[in-house]
Design a protein with these regions (language model features):
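Beta-strand-rich N-terminal accessory domains
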Residues: 1-76, 216-240
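Extended, loop-rich substrate-binding clefts of extracytoplasmic carbohydrate-active enzymes
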Residues: 6-8, 72, 77-131
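Short hydrophobic/aromatic-rich beta-strand segments that constitute the beta-sheet cores
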Residues: 26-27, 76, 107-110, 135-138, ...
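Active-site/ligand-binding surface loops and adjacent short beta/alpha elements
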Residues: 75, 147-149, 157-238
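Short, intrinsically disordered, charge-balanced linker/junction segments flanking boundaries
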Residues: 239-252
């Protein structure tokens, strides 16, 4: 049984799991699912990235789980056997602590002392409502003595809409292991329709895209990120009724 905390306002109803990375496991508007809801742990185990809006830190794949920073070498857990990479870190698996909970707001935090990422920081997440919209705020505080390198992203998965548009203008080049290799491809004919508006039915697509704005439209809903993030990647998978928009703080 997954313990959840509920907040609501007007027609919005949100359920958050502290134990599952502080994730939004259900988001409804007027009784209808907006995010793909988490229904059971088997669903989460099959693919933890397409349930709600999991926090990815570091985002995307780290080749061989290895990176260097300021003269030091670091090794992350290999979480994707097929590519031998660390995929999206493990913060989304960590239990968060609820520090404030009211009818229309919840704040949770995760204190990392090296268990999920080899640097010290505190990540605070607040879910609330503003101007009849559901809002998410993320604050990361460096609690160590040195600099902290990170990429941060949200893998937000909506119930598949009838149509969508996303602000993208180029596609990142990547290798066979889905790692960016530098440079861009121009959008093809189908991808160009994603910018002006496209039906989502029967589309099978996956790619890293450069953002040229901060608002996407998913059906009747707008998804807007702050200037600290960009919308740079989206995914639909044919045969599944979901639609993913990934917002992140740096090039992936």
């Amino acid at each position: 049984m997954i313990k959840t905390y509920e907040i609501k306002n007007g027609l919005w109803q949100v359920k958050v799991s502290a134990e599952l990375g502080g994730n939004v496991v259900s988001l409804k508007y007027d009784g209808k699912d907006v995010f793909v809801p988490l229904e059971n742990m088997e669903q989460l185990a099959a693919n933890p990235y397409i349930q709600g809006a999991p926090i990815l830190l570091p985002a995307n794949r780290t080749a061989d789980g290895k990176f260097s920073f300021e003269g030091e070498n670091y090794q992350l857990e290999i979480t994707e056997a097929s590519t031998g990479a660390n995929l999206h870190g493990i913060v989304h698996r960590q239990p968060f602590t609820v520090i404030e909970h009211s009818e229309d707001k919840i704040t949770l935090c995760f204190e990392n002392n090296g268990q999920a990422y080899p640097f010290n920081f505190v990540l605070t997440v607040t879910y609330y409502f503003e101007n009849d919209a559901f809002a998410q705020r993320y604050d990361i505080k460096n609690t160590g003595s040195g600099n902290v390198p990170f990429t941060f992203a949200l893998h937000t998965t909506f119930v598949e809409p009838e149509s969508f548009d996303v602000p993208i203008d180029a596609c990142h080049k990547k290798n066979e292991k889905h790692l960016p290799i530098g440079g861009y491809f121009p959008l093809n004919e189908q991808e160009s329709r994603y910018v002006t508006g496209s039906p989502s039915k029967d589309i099978s697509a996956s790619g890293y895209y450069r953002a040229c704005g901060n608002t996407a439209h998913i059906g009747h809903f707008s998804y807007t990120v702050s200037d600290n993030l960009t919308i740079g990647f989206f995914l639909t998978v044919q045969g599944r009724e979901d639609f993913c928009v990934l917002s992140h703080n740096a090039a992936l």
